[in-house]
């Protein structure tokens, strides 16, 4: 496995998307497509709720899988040891900071939890409080769709860098 520590590759700002124990193949397929179109690296943390060769994952990711830098890791610690993120953000409905108030840097890593339960409290507690992010929603709503949440955060980070490498 190659170590992905480079924060800028071929004129692109590289961000890392980490899906902690994702459960729903179409969401991950959509995020594969998002990664291919934004240049973000995608990391899946086991156990996965599906087989990465599953038909619904392939269908949602279309032909973008070949254009995506995606790796599957046995646990978050191994992932972090390999990508060596300068900063990581826990994205959760229990976040303390709005995602749009942060100045993002190349190499930032965004960690999202499984669709049915979100990130474990213990993992959120490991993250510095100012890096526990949330996406605003109307009161009494439970959560946003995982692939939508990833798109909102990644595109805000890339926007702050003037969509470098994009067209």
Language-model-detected regions and their locations in the chain:
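Post-transcriptional modification and biogenesis factors for structured RNAs
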Residues: 1-167
